[in-house]
């Protein structure tokens, strides 16, 4: 009888664990509502060319945040989907001065590790259309 209860308990735990895995993919991105701290991080990171990884050669100014997802790693990856416009110089980074520019959607990934004082723009790519 105790053996049967143990099997039933184990099966129940396995079922609960598989349901929880479906809800949250470990290591995957999770949808998040942008807070004022998230917006400040985005603005700080994208306004200074010194915070861009050397492999990031796309430069844009920002018009609006369209979406945010986060991923916990050895810190946090923030994947912002933004409306923005391509710019020619680092002086134009940050918020767009010309709000009537020909904007597109971009994904900006920013890595943040507060305990080591690390903030880095790791990629800027055109966003895929989600229609």
From Swiss-Prot:
Q: What induces it?
A: Expressed during infection of host plant and in germinating cysts.
- Record gene name: EPIC3
The organism of origin for this protein: Phytophthora infestans
Q: Which family does it belong to?
A: Belongs to the cystatin family.
Motif residue range(s): Secondary area of contact? 71-75
Chain positions of site Reactive site: 27
The places in or outside the cell where this protein is found are:
Secreted
Q: Report the GO molecular function annotations.
A: cysteine-type endopeptidase inhibitor activity
Glycan attachment residues as annotated in the record: 33
> Source organism's superkingdom?
Eukaryota
User: Where does it primarily localize?
Assistant: secreted
What is the name of this protein? Answer: Cystatin-like cysteine protease inhibitor EPIC3
Sorted UniProt keywords: Glycoprotein, Protease inhibitor, Secreted, Signal, Thiol protease inhibitor, Virulence
The residues forming a coiled coil are none
Looking at the UniProt record for this protein, which Gene Ontology cellular component terms does it annotate, in alphabetical order? extracellular region
What the protein does? Secreted effector that interacts with and inhibits host apoplastic pathogenesis-related papain-like cysteine proteases. Inhibition of host proteases by a pathogen extracellular protease inhibitor forms a specific type of defense-counterdefense mechanism between plants and microbial pathogens.
- The signal peptide here is 1-20
Q: Which SUPFAM superfamilies match?
A: Cystatin/monellin
Task: Spell out the Gene3D superfamilies in the cross-references.
Answer: 3.10.450.10
